Amino acid sequence: MGQKINPIGFRVGVIRDWDAKWYADKKEYVPALQEDLRIRKYLETNLKDAAVDRITIERTEPTRINLTIHTAKPGIVIGRGGADVERLRSELSKIVDTYKGQHKRVNINIVEIRKPDLNAHLVGQQIAADLERRVAFRRAMRGAIQRVQRAGAKGVRTMVSGRLNGADIARKEQYTEGTVPLHTLRADIDYSWDEAMTSYGNLGIKTWIYRGDAENGQFIKDEDVAAAANNRGRGNNRGRGNSRQNGGRSRRPRQGQASTQGRGGNN
């Protein structure tokens, strides 16, 4: 099951929290859902350059909507002196419906993503941007994997499907580094599906990032991901330093270097 199902939906309620936190009666459910779709569509359209990962919508009262925007570029969303976020709030107030003649109040909270290279959606967007700039797909995928590993991930998998390099027959290729335990529910695996629009057609991009295990069944937060990655990075640096001091294996000289040394010795 873990190989087929969406990894995020598979872990909702276990280590992942919901993106929509509200409850409505039968008559109010459909209007509230349509309202959520309008809000998400507007924000995705107007914040496409702000590196937004996900948007959380919470309704604590019938006349209040709390939005939480997770972004790697909070300055673009907030703007100078908070002008842009105020403009978003006023525009969203016009989009949402009224409740019994009262206008709903929209509150916007901004959460910074401190480790964008550990976010599957942002990594997939970067691969899509590279493919749209005609970068070779293998180079784009390997570059993304290297960035994710340097950020402190335990495993990463990327897949690109479509007319790769303009081939007549569509195919898919994937690269995996480390481990990606899809069946383990406590494993914090971020997943994303993105799309690159090229002159040969659209390419699908799937990204899986294994960021570690959740502790005590708590929901994963962006702050926890950044802290865990920093701890793993410090541990890896200490390990590499000790291996150098103890004397690791030296690299074998290249053939060109060996022949040059031999000629020098004969002279």
UniProtKB/Swiss-Prot annotation:
Its protein name is Small ribosomal subunit protein uS3
Transmembrane parts of this sequence? none
InterPro entries linked to this entry: KH_dom (IPR004087), KH_dom-like_a/b (IPR015946), KH_dom_type_2 (IPR004044), KH_sf_prok-type (IPR009019), Ribosomal_S3_C_sf (IPR036419), Ribosomal_uS3_bac-typ (IPR005704), Ribosomal_uS3_C (IPR001351), Ribosomal_uS3_CS (IPR018280)
Oligomeric state and partners?
A: Part of the 30S ribosomal subunit. Forms a tight complex with proteins S10 and S14.
Q: Which Pfam families match?
A: KH_2, Ribosomal_S3_C
Which family does the similarity line name? Belongs to the universal ribosomal protein uS3 family.
What role is this protein assigned? Binds the lower part of the 30S subunit head. Binds mRNA in the 70S ribosome, positioning it for translation.
Q: Which PANTHER family match?
A: 30S/40S RIBOSOMAL PROTEIN S3, SMALL RIBOSOMAL SUBUNIT PROTEIN US3C
Region named Disordered:
229-267
One Gene Ontology BP term is:
translation
- The KH type-2 domain sits at 39-114
This protein's UniProt keywords = Ribonucleoprotein, Ribosomal protein, RNA-binding, rRNA-binding
State one molecular function term (GO).
Answer: structural constituent of ribosome
Question: Would you tell me the Gene Ontology cellular component terms?
Answer: cytosolic small ribosomal subunit
Biased composition of type Low complexity is found at 229-248
